Design a protein with these regions (language model features):
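Acidic/His-rich, divalent-metal-binding segments that scaffold phosphate/diphosphate chemistry
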Residues: 1-68, 124
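Active-site helical microenvironments for divalent-metal-assisted chemistry
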Residues: 7, 132-135, 148, 152
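Residues within well-ordered alpha helices
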Residues: 11, 35-38, 79, 160, ...
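Alpha-helical structural elements of signaling/regulatory helical domains
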Residues: 17-20, 84, 145
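Charged catalytic carboxylate motif
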Residues: 27, 31, 75, 111, ...
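Divalent metal-dependent catalytic cores for phosphoryl transfer on phosphate-bearing substrates
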Residues: 41-142
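Charged phosphate-binding loop/patch that engages nucleotide di/tri-phosphates or the phosphate backbone
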Residues: 146-184
Length: 184
C-alpha cells in the first residue's frame, strides 16, 4: 500500500527519526512533489501519492543505521516491507544508488525521489555540484573507494537531471525560486 501522510509521520515517530532528518525528508518531498506535478502537466503518468510517501520515508532508517552500521536504504526497504508499504519499498531502497536507470526510459517515481534527495543538503535546496562537494567531503575523505562510487552516482544524477528538465518549463538552477513562488 501507499501510506498516507499520517502513517508516514507516525512511522517517523515509531522509528525515532530525528528532527533534522524529518526536515530534510520534508524538503525532498517538496521538490519531488513540485517536479511530479509539473511532469504530470507535461503528460507523464506519475503517482503524486507514491512520490510524496516515498520522499517522506526515504530516510526512515537513517538514524537507526547510524547506530548499527547497516545500510540505511536496505534497512529502510525492510521497514517498508514489514509495514506493508510495498509500493514505496523500491523508492526507499534506491534513493542512494539508482539501479537499472535508462536515460532514454520513462521517468519513474523512484527516479524523481532519487533526484530530489540529491538536491537537498540538510534542509536547503542546493545544486547537484554543491551536494556532490558536500558528499565527497563528508564520506569520501576517509574512505578512498567511496569517491569513485559517489562520482558514478552523480553522473547518473546529471543524466537524470537533463532528462527531467527537458520536460519542464524551468531550469535546474531555478528550482529553489520556483519552490518559493509556488508556496512549497
Amino acid at each position: 500500500m501507499i501510506p498516507s501522510l499520517d502513517i508516514c509521520f507516525r512511522l517517523m515517530d515509531t522509528y525515532e527519526m530525528p528532527e533534522n532528518i524529518r526536515r530534510h525528508s520534508m524538503m525532498v518531498e517538496r521538490i519531488a512533489s513540485l517536479i511530479t506535478r509539473r511532469l504530470r502537466k507535461a503528460g507523464l503518468g506519475l503517482s503524486p501519492e507514491k512520490v510524496t510517501a516515498g520522499a517522506l520515508m526515504h530516510d526512515i532508517a537513517k538514524s537507526l543505521c547510524l547506530k548499527t552500521g547497516e545500510v540505511h536504504s536496505v534497512k529502510g526497504r525492510d521497514i517498508c516491507l514489514q509495514n506493508h508499504l510495498d509500493e514505496i519499498a523500491d523508492i526507499v531502497a534506491e534513493h542512494v544508488v539508482l539501479n537499472n536507470h535508462r536515460p532514454e526510459g520513462q521517468l519513474t517515481e523512484k527516479e524523481i525521489v532519487y533526484y530530489a534527495d540529491k538536491r537537498v543538503n540538510h534542509d536547503i535546496v542546493v545544486s547537484l555540484e554543491d551536494r556532490l562537494r558536500y558528499l565527497l567531503e563528508r564520506y569520501a575523505k576517509e574512505v578512498a573507494h567511496l569517491e569513485a562510487a559517489i562520482m558514478r552516482n552523480f553522473q547518473v544524477c546529471k543524466e537524470l537531471e537533463r532528462s527531467i528538465f527537458s520536460k519542464l518549463d524551468f531550469k535546474p538552477e531555478d528550482l529553489a525560486g520556483v519552490l518559493r513562488r509556488e508556496g512549497y
